[in-house]
């Protein structure tokens, strides 16, 4: 009986060792897809009282679609299109571009916020995912007025 116990213990140890090595190797070689990729176009030096056109292209490396809500925030009040909140469905085979138009009266620092949300009625058949790792992305920009 003792020989059988030693054999099963050795076999179990060998199996666990092989599985552990296989899992570690698989994780090291795999690249993690990014939930959101940004491409932002903002004029850097418009004239005072000039209308600024800003665009933000969003895409995902996920196989599934995401529902995103994008908006701008600033400590300086800005009227017009600056305050629009835009909600879209982003899929890996279809990047989406969002646009904002607003007038700058002074140098303006603002934040572009993109939240991955669970809103229904945006993606086809309401099929979309929210990543566990994080659902809020942002970047800061400054527009310097001449």
Curated annotation (Swiss-Prot):
Residue(s) carrying Pyrrolidone carboxylic acid: 27
Keyword DNA damage attached: no
Organism classification: Eukaryota, Metazoa, Chordata, Craniata, Vertebrata
Name of the gene: Pip
Cellular component, GO annotation: apical plasma membrane; extracellular region; extracellular space; nucleus
One GO term (biological process): proteolysis
GO molecular function, one term: aspartic-type endopeptidase activity
Disulfide cysteine pairs (residue numbers): 65-91, 89-123
Subcellular location: Secreted
UniProt main location, coarse: secreted
InterPro entries: Ig-like_fold, Ig_E-set, PIP
Protein name, per record: Prolactin-inducible protein homolog
Organism encoding this protein: Rattus norvegicus
């Amino acid at each position: 009986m003792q020989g059988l116990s030693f054999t099963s213990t050795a076999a179990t140890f060998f199996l666990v060792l092989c599985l552990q090595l296989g899992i570690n190797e698989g994780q090291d070689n795999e690249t993690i897809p990014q939930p959101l990729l940004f491409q932002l176009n903002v004029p850097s030096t418009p004239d005072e009282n000039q209308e600024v056109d800003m665009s933000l292209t969003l895409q995902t490396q996920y196989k599934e679609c995401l529902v995103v809500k994008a908006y701008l925030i600033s400590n300086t009040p800005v009227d017009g299109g600056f305050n629009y909140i835009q909600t879209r469905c982003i899929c890996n085979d279809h990047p989406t571009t969002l646009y904002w138009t607003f007038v700058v009266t002074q140098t303006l620092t603002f934040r572009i916020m993109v939240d991955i949300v669970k809103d229904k009625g945006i993606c086809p058949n309401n099929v979309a995912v929210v990543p566990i790792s994080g659902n809020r992305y942002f970047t800061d920009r400054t527009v310097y007025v001449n």
